[in-house]
UniProtKB/Swiss-Prot annotation:
Name of the protein this chain belongs to: ATP-dependent lipid A-core flippase
Role according to the record: Involved in lipopolysaccharide (LPS) biosynthesis. Translocates lipid A-core from the inner to the outer leaflet of the inner membrane. Transmembrane domains (TMD) form a pore in the inner membrane and the ATP-binding domain (NBD) is responsible for energy generation.
Ranges annotated as spanning the membrane: 27-47, 69-89, 142-162, 165-185, 249-269
NCBIfam families reported for this sequence: MsbA_lipidA, PRK11176.1
Alphabetically ordered keywords of this record: ATP-binding, Cell inner membrane, Cell membrane, Lipid transport, Membrane, Nucleotide-binding, Translocase, Transmembrane, Transmembrane helix, Transport
Gene3D superfamilies: ABC transporter type 1, transmembrane domain, P-loop containing nucleotide triphosphate hydrolases
Domain ABC transmembrane type-1: from-to ranges: 28-310
Binding site for ATP: 376-383
Record field: catalytic activity: ATP + H2O + lipid A-core oligosaccharideSide 1 = ADP + phosphate + lipid A-core oligosaccharideSide 2
Enzyme class per UniProt: translocase
Organism lineage string: Bacteria, Pseudomonadati, Pseudomonadota, Gammaproteobacteria, Vibrionales
Family: Belongs to the ABC transporter superfamily. Lipid exporter (TC 3.A.1.106) family.
């Protein structure tokens, strides 16, 4: 599932235009204001001809007396049009960036788990933050310059040809060379911009890795290692930025040097007698000033090329990401509440990028209302089985059925509503305890339901000691709670969901013995009318399971209840002796 970034600038801009055109009212107003702004500049230059030919040459002329008023009016128009264009394009740009950013965020939420397994979190964050912000460069600053400077160039050219087409023809010799130069610079800018996106992703990933592992860094004295790692990626980002600045700084004088040949040629032609006879001081000054005035928009267009190409490179990356295939959801079958009969039939599965299967020909049944426990050493494939139930991954062969129907036939959201998962890796949101327990179902349950679930999970024991109780903000990933408290909140969330199938993946691993016993009693009560899959290292928590499966190296090597497996004196009995020191 790789990102395709082979689109041309034009193809990318056409896709971006589909977003821009949604706010065409603001765009139209901005373009009109920009054109007015450019016309005002051109008109100011055109005033040089009557000023020189009539103003100073005719003592009775009223032109000099009206000129201050004309200049005041033109500056007012110029200032007003500049404000309107900047505001409107910023409004358009802000909405486009917000829309693209939302699309990327929403697409991330529908990507398969396998995609996130191989992508750096920092790189993905950079797509939402840095890359989407770069789109603004192509929809505001760049568009302002392109329209305004483009209109200025057209206006100045019209002014030049109107006053002296002979002198103005010089531009036809220079224009192709200038266009070629801008084209070369654009390609360079885009290449560097893509590299900058990659480097920014690395910077974000390095910072995110340190922040998430801050306690480990402090505990092991890893500050120097992390500093060196961050210094390296930061310097790489700086180098790419300097390449962009160098290209931009070199492009300006080169383009202006090429354009200066036109000015030199005009001065030479103006000295030829046959042409000089047709020129008035005002005409020559207007043509020369207009040609010299072309330098500013040419410089601005060269500068804006880097902004535009940054925006195009970012847009290309974001569109390529949006084009990635989301997780498959081809099932149509839905059920309000499943009965809970689960069957795993000859399932094999291999993670992407791995040559060794994680599961091989695994089969077992969990009848409705029964509890099946999976035990075994770490990496044996226990959690993989739980992940397949929710279709975080799809089986390579075999099938998993719920109430006799393949889980791939279920509509994905409806399927996941039938399972409540408590993982060993608890994730809580930066919100209140109540909202974490009722996550994604805030409008479905009453406050009393949330409190009841918290009591069953023995979470109210510590919640009642907090000043704001269930309304306490717990910080990012429950930073203000202990490991055991976080796990009890996660258990309360699963209890509130009241799904027909309960998956407990090391659900009590972070609890002390007393809390574990209390919660186990609540779970025993809860499991009476539910199908339960328990993954456990602590064998004391699964002794009452209807069936225990011993998993090793992706295969089931033993099965039976606790008493039967102890009597067999096999792998389970050995694990039991190790844990209980028998």
């Amino acid at each position: 599932m790789s990102i395709n970034t082979d689109e041309t600038t034009w193809q990318t801009f056409k896709r971006l235009w589909q977003f821009i055109r949604l706010y065409k009212s603001g765009l139209i107003v901005a373009v009109i204001a920009l054109v007015i702004n450019a016309i005002s500049d051109t008109y100011m230059i055109s005033l040089l001809k009557p000023l020189l030919d009539e103003g100073f040459g005719n003592a009775d002329s009223d032109f000099l007396r009206t000129l201050p008023l004309i200049i005041f009016v033109m500056m007012f128009i110029r200032g007003t049009s500049g404000f309107v264009s900047t505001y409107c394009l910023s409004w358009v740009s802000g909405n486009v960036v917000m829309l693209v950013r939302r699309m990327v965020f929403n697409h991330f939420m529908h990507m398969p788990v396998s995609y996130f397994d191989k992508e750096k979190t920092g790189n993905l964050l950079s797509r939402i933050t840095y890359d989407s912000e770069q789109v603004s460069a192509a929809t505001s600053q760049a568009l302002v310059s392109i329209v305004r400077e483009g209109a200025s160039i057209i206006g100045l050219l019209v002014l030049m040809f109107y006053n002296s087409w002979q002198l103005s023809l010089v531009l036809f010799a220079v224009a192709p060379v200038v266009a070629w130069g801008i084209g070369v610079v654009s390609k360079r800018f885009r290449k560097i911009s893509k590299n900058m996106q990659t480097m920014m992703g690395n910077v974000t990933a390095s910072a995110e890795q340190m922040l998430k592992g801050h306690k480990v860094v402090l505990s092991y004295g890893g500050q120097d290692i992390e500093r060196q790692r961050f210094d390296k990626v930061s310097n790489q980002m700086r180098q790419q930025s300097m390449k962009l600045v160098t290209a931009q700084a070199a492009a300006n004088p080169i383009i202006q040097m090429i354009a200066s040949f036109a000015i030199v040629a005009v001065l030479y032609l103006a000295s030829i007698d046959s042409i000089k006879e047709q020129l008035t001081p005002g005409t020559f000054t207007v043509v020369f000033s207009a040609m010299f005035g072309l330098m500013r928009p040419l410089k601005a267009l060269t500068n804006v090329t880097s902004q535009f190409q940054r925006g195009m490179a970012a847009s290309q990356t974001l569109f390529a990401l949006i084009d990635l295939e989301p997780e498959k959801n081809e099932g149509k079958y839905t059920v309000e509440r499943a009965k809970g009969d689960v069957s795993v039939k000859d399932v094999s599965f291999t993670y992407v990028g791995s040559e060794k299967p994680a599961l091989e020909h695994v089969s077992f049944d969990i009848p409705r209302g029964k509890t099946v426990a999976l035990v075994g050493r770490s990496g044996s494939g226990k959690s993989t089985i739980a992940n397949l139930f929710n279709r975080f991954y799809d089986v390579d062969s075999g099938s998993i059925t719920l109430d006799g129907r393949d889980i791939r036939d279920y509509e994905l959201k409806n399927l996941r509503e039938q399972f409540a998962l408590v993982s060993q890796n608890v994730h809580l949101f930066n919100d209140t305890i109540a909202n974490n327990i009722a996550y994604a179902t805030e409008d479905k349950y009453e406050r009393s339901d949330i409190e009841h679930a918290a009591k069953l999970a023995h979470a109210m024991e510590f919640i009642n000691k907090m000043e704001n109780g269930l309304d306490t903000m717990i910080g990012e990933n429950g930073a203000s709670l202990s490991g055991g408290q976080r796990q009890r909140v996660a258990i309360a969330r699963a209890l509130l969901r009241d799904a027909p199938v309960l998956i407990l993946d090391e659900a009590t691993s972070a609890l002390d013995t007393e809390s574990e016993r209390a919660i186990q009693a609540a779970l025993d009560e809860l499991q009476k009318d539910k199908t339960v899959l328990v993954i456990a290292h602590r064998l004391s928590t699964i002794e009452k399971a209807d069936e225990i499966l011993v998993v090793d190296d992706g295969a089931i090597i033993e099965r039976g209840n606790h008493a039967d497996l102890i009597a067999k004196n096999g792998a389970y009995a050995q694990l039991h002796r190790i844990q209980f020191g028998e």
